[in-house]
């Protein structure tokens, strides 16, 4: 399907000069969140966008629909022009051809005042981005577009792609692409981690800007070695890095913790007028973009997801100011560390989509950064190695409640920790037990690291049962379920 989609874009370019920005996302975990958020940021910045792929709807269905919509728009505009020309024959000839050109990143202070309806500390932080901080990512150069069909089609495509789609694709060349992370998954299909990672790496094509998670060694290994040319400086593949730590290169994104506050930041080149010695370290200016607490999606891992989306949308020429407001508005995807309720100062989270070890590790690290967590684990383990859970459980968990068929396997993997391990017969019992273990300020996280089919119809059904169990606790405590944000 991906090869056919790529061929379709090539045909549209040949026929109409259509050259959209294509932003592609893959990774073991976080794909849907980053895809959805990137699409929202692009739209918030005023560009027309289509989101498709593994997230749904399919690539070809969405492309077919976009072409049909564009044809209708072009026909309507042609009819309107013809009617106007009949009324005033000189009107059309006096109007210049309309062209579009790539936009550039503008400053956060360029956001209209009407966007800042609520006066908060976050608004002040966004508005404090001054002109000297207005560095721009290198943007792809697109030709001016004259054909009405090309103008009517989306300016940007945001695609969520799986390893299965990428494994056999040909001719796919996105503008920018990311592999968010790599951990064990789908090894029954790919045969090995090396083959799985190689399939993911196909997303970059030959020329795409590589948006890389610098905290994932397997992702960083996907960047090719510089091409060495005789008597010339080695040529590096264009890349922008993001991660949960401080950025170390101009243009990269990261997280800064200062005076107890966590910020999303970008590194900019220091004052270029101050020439440094040839062997001196590169000087950076850290631009604070917004407090991480202003995000509605919770956890450090989601702050990193936000940085990935911000980097991708920036590469398509989206204005920074509107995107930062878009980040604050995004509420997240269902069953992905989704807040459910706060009961007696304990917050409950539904992460039923956490069906593999990597997803649960990320959720524990994300929520555990500022609180202790009681985690509900277990289900159909898919033959995974659960040992990577031991470290985050040891660091962040107050207790573990085990359910499902592979609970004994997970117990064995966590036996070396000093965190109490409890067994529960079903989800209702697990929620009640987790609530009893949790203390004020803690989180109860249902992130099973397993598939759901041993006890439930699917992960959505598992989430529904979890939410019902939390609702029963809330009712007994006299708390409304709206307590979750």
Identify the role of each PLM range:
Residues 1-2, 176-182, 230-242, 372-375, ...:
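Short hydrophobic/aromatic-enriched beta-strand-loop microsegments
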Residues 1-2, 25, 50-53, 157-159, ...:
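General beta-strand structural signal in soluble alpha/beta enzymes
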Residues 2-7, 54-57, 78, 182-185, ...:
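Short, acidic/turn-prone active-site loops that include or flank metal/cofactor-
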Residues 8-57:
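Walker A (P-loop) phosphate-binding motif
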Residues 12, 18-20, 45, 61-156, ...:
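Acidic, Mg2+-coordinating active-site environments of NTP-dependent enzymes
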Residues 24-26, 160, 181, 213, ...:
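Short beta-strand segments
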Residues 36, 43, 312-321, 325-335, ...:
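ATP-dependent carboxylate-amine ligase
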Residues 166:
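Carbohydrate-associated surface elements
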């Amino acid at each position: 399907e991906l090869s056919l989609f790529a061929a379709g874009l090539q045909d549209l370019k040949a026929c109409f000069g259509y050259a959209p920005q294509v932003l592609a996302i893959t990774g073991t975990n976080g794909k849907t969140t980053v895809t959805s958020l990137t699409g929202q940021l692009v739209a918030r910045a005023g560009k027309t966008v289509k989101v498709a792929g593994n997230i749904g709807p399919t690539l070809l269905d969405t492309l077919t629909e976009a072409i049909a919509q564009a044809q209708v728009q072009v026909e309507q505009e042609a009819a309107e022009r013809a009617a106007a020309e009949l009324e005033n024959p000189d009107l059309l000839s006096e109007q210049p051809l309309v062209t579009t050109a790539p936009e550039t990143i503008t400053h956060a202070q360029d956001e209209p005042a009407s966007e800042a309806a609520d006066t908060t500390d976050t608004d002040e932080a966004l508005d404090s981005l001054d002109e000297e901080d207005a560095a721009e990512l290198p943007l792809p150069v697109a030709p001016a577009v004259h054909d009405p069909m090309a103008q009517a089609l989306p300016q940007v495509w945001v695609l969520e792609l799986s390893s299965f789609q990428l494994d056999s694709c040909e001719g796919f060349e996105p503008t920018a692409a990311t592999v968010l992370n790599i951990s064990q998954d789908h090894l029954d299909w790919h045969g090995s981690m090396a083959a799985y990672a190689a399939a993911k790496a196909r997303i970059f094509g030959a020329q795409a800007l590589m948006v890389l998670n610098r905290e994932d060694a397997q992702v960083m290994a996907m960047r090719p070695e510089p091409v060495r040319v005789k008597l010339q400086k080695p040529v590096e593949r264009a890349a922008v890095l993001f991660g949960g730590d401080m950025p170390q290169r101009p243009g990269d994104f990261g997280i800064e913790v200062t005076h107890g506050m966590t910020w999303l930041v970008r590194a900019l080149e220091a004052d270029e007028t101050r020439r440094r010695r040839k062997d001196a370290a590169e000087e950076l200016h850290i631009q604070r973009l917004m407090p991480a607490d202003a995000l509605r999606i919770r956890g450090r891992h989601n702050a990193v997801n936000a940085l990935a989306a911000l980097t991708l949308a920036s590469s398509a020429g989206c204005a920074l100011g509107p995107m930062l407001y878009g980040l604050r508005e995004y509420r997240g995807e269902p069953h992905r560390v989704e807040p459910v309720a706060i009961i007696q100062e304990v917050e409950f989270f539904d992460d039923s989509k956490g069906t593999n070890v990597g997803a649960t590790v990320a959720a524990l690290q994300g929520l555990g950064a500022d609180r202790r967590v009681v985690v509900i684990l277990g289900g159909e383990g898919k033959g995974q190695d659960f040992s990577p859970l031991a470290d985050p459980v040891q660091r962040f968990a107050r207790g573990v409640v085990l359910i499902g068929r592979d609970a004994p396997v997970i117990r064995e993997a966590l036996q070396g920790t000093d965190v109490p391990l409890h067994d529960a017969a079903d989800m209702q019992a697990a929620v009640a037990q987790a609530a009893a273990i949790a203390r004020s300020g803690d989180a109860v996280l249902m992130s099973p690291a397993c598939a759901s089919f041993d006890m439930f119809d699917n992960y959505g059904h598992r989430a529904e049962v979890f939410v019902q169990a939390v609702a029963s606790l809330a009712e007994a405590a006299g708390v409304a379920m709206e307590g979750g944000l």
